[in-house]
């Protein structure tokens, strides 16, 4: 039977909504990957009595309590003292931890204060969990088959402690080997879930879907007697998803679509440029987040004004006047012009209405046109985001542009596009046909 867990986030600022709780999401996924069933997520304020009552109740529900937050030096940082008491433990001063704190303050040009000594208190019967990235050590307590692990609330410190210390500790307690891999899949969650539903019901390996903007992750986890067997099980199960989804599965174990785009461009000796209007450089930013992007990406044009579109990437002002700046012909000329100006093999373009104002009956807010040029052709697509959320519209547009770039880098035709020859980019009949076809979608 698998271990059960509860994630407990401590901090009044979380209850007030002043801080977004990203720790709970991260830990839920990490625990699931270890085969540990998360029964509940809870948020508790900085109050000793309420926290103690909650801990004693949670011990009856789960094998493992995972805490984040409340390990600081101030009077309202109560997690360590409270959990220690609930687990029948006490705390003692650790000179080594104190010296680390003193050294940290010295490096940053500050002086310690008496309340900083609080962070150097560690369990007597349990053990400390070393924090290599901050001043607050974590803690591990055990009593009557129940465990509690305490980690800092600062996300980067918590993640580092989890990866370096807590995850290996939990793995060592498992009586089997676990292996996970993550498939990155283009498309929405509801359609994907419908297509792969039978594969989500198997107990081992398990598969879970996590929704992102314009794509999903499928995390596959296998439990076996040894790591080799677990890897083999994961690989075989992943093949079932590939068989169902085809090239909608674009990669495995990558941070995002931009990473795959950059790697594919590098593998094929290709370069890319961008011409962005409503996304304002988001595509370029995502590409340059990837190490090694400088080998494939040299030019990014942010052409917010109509004059910029004409001056930087050669859009014909007459085309803007006839078809509107948010149109398929403009997206086509932006992509072709960016490729030419940058000397790039591939270029993507975006022009759209992110709102909240500016829309009309023909082009409501959420209307976006995208172009992707390679060689003597440009592929143009219309995207409509029905929810009038500026951030979402821009994010979806950037994601779609990267998807189109990936398909061109793979030598494929981007789905849902209309093609225009480079030689026809100034042909009134061809531009009108392109405009009418995509406006009708």
Regions found by a protein language model. Give the residues of each.
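Accessory alpha-helical/coil subdomains and C-terminal extensions
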Residues: 142-214, 219-221, 229-234
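Conserved hydrophobic helix-helix packing surfaces used for dimerization/oligomerization
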Residues: 5-7, 148, 272
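Proline/glycine-rich low-complexity loops and linkers
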Residues: 50-53, 77-173
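Glycine-rich phosphate/diphosphate-binding loop of Rossmann-like nucleotide-binding domains
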Residues: 2-41, 228-232
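Short alpha-helical segments enriched in small residues
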Residues: 229-441
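Glycine-rich beta-strand-to-loop/alpha-helix junction loops that act as flexible
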Residues: 10-12, 67-75, 152, 223, ...
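Glycine-rich oxoanion-binding loops at beta->alpha junctions
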Residues: 28, 32-57, 93-134, 308-345
């Amino acid at each position: 039977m698998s271990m059960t867990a509860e994630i407990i986030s401590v901090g009044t600022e979380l209850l007030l909504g002043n801080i977004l709780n990203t720790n709970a999401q991260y830990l839920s996924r990490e625990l699931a990957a270890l085969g540990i069933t998360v029964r509940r997520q809870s948020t508790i304020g900085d109050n000793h009595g309420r926290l103690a009552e909650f801990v004693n109740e949670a011990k009856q529900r789960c094998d493992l309590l995972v805490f984040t937050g409340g390990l600081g030096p101030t009077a309202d940082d109560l997690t360590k003292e409270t959990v220690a008491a609930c687990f029948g433990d006490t705390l003692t001063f650790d000179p080594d931890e104190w010296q680390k704190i003193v050294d940290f303050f010295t490096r940053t040009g500050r002086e310690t204060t008496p309340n900083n000594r609080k962070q150097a208190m560690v369990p007597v019967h349990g053990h400390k969990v070393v924090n290599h990235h901050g001043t607050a050590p974590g803690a591990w307590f055990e009593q009557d088959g129940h465990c509690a692990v305490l980690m800092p609330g600062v996300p980067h410190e918590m993640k580092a402690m989890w990866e370096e210390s807590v995850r290996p500790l939990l793995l060592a307690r498992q009586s089997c080997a676990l292996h996970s891999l993550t498939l990155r899949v283009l498309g929405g969650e509801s359609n994907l879930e419908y297509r792969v539903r039978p594969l989500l019901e198997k107990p081992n390996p398990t598969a879970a879907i996590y929704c992102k903007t314009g794509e999903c992750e499928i995390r596959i986890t296998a439990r076996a007697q040894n790591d080799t067997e677990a890897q083999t099980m994961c690989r075989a199960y992943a093949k079932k998803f590939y068989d169902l989804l085809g090239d909608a599965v674009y990669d495995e174990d990558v941070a995002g679509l931009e990473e795959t785009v950059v790697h594919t461009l590098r593998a094929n000796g290709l370069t890319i440029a961008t011409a962005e209007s409503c996304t304002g450089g988001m595509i370029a930013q995502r590409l340059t987040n990837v190490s090694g992007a400088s080998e494939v990406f040299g030019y990014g044009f942010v052409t917010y004004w109509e004059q910029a579109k004409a001056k930087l990437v050669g859009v014909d002002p007459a085309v803007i006047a006839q078809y509107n700046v948010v149109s398929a012909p403009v997206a086509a000329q932006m992509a072709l012009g960016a490729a030419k100006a940058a000397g790039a093999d591939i270029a993507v373009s975006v022009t759209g209405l992110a709102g909240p104002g500016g829309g009309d009956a023909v082009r409501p807010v959420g209307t976006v046109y995208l172009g992707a040029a390679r060689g003597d052709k440009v592929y143009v697509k219309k995207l409509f985001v029905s929810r009038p959320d500026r951030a979402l519209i821009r994010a979806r547009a950037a994601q779609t542009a990267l998807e189109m770039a990936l398909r061109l880098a793979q030598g494929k035709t981007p789905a849902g596009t209309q093609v225009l020859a480079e030689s026809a980019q100034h042909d009134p009949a061809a531009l009108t046909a392109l405009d009418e076809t995509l406006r009708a979608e």
